[in-house]
Amino acid sequence: MRTTDLRFDELHSLSREIYEEYFDVMPISEDQKTDRVLIAMALEDRFLEILSLAEIRQKQDKPWLGEIIELFTLAFLAVANRRVDDDEIRAKAERFGQEVGLSTFAHQGEEYFTSADRAINMSATEANAIMCYGELADAIKRGCTVKTWKTILDGREREWHHEEDGVTVPITEPFEVGGELMMYPLDDSLGASADNIANCRCCAIYS
């Protein structure tokens, strides 16, 4: 059954199960897993509304790209600020809004780009990104000096993420992952592409 065939309450129940399964395999505490699920669900609520609006706007003869970019940016920030509130998360929200807004605009008429499936995929990815950044910020405040990349080794991981598993670097220096620099898993602040980020279940351990 497609998620588009479900009522909202059924979709919410299904997506929670998806998020719980998605994050359950990560080598993090139960509290960290729960936080990721709750953030993903909050993001999903907002993303579904925006994608629905984008679908409507596509049928109207007036500009809508700027509106959708702003809505995605504000939605990301509203949820992310529950975990962390600083200049970096605000910059990340702006990058997210631009990227997702532009891709939605570029793929007008393609069902997936305004679908619940896309909202769920984005929510899982961005919930992990928000939490990974928050955990880095917390570790710096605690005085941790190193960080170790952890990859879920279940055959679904990217080959270069498999190779990165267990790599330890100073906390203020980036990992080099598949030729791209990342301060933490799912970090795009140094130019990492979606090839390194989308649906990534990696995390970092700090000491």
Regions found by a protein language model. Give the residues of each.
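N-terminal leader/targeting and assembly helices and adjacent pre-domain segments
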Residues: 1-142, 206-207
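Acidic, glycine-rich two-metal-ion catalytic cores of nucleic acid-processing enzymes
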Residues: 116-207
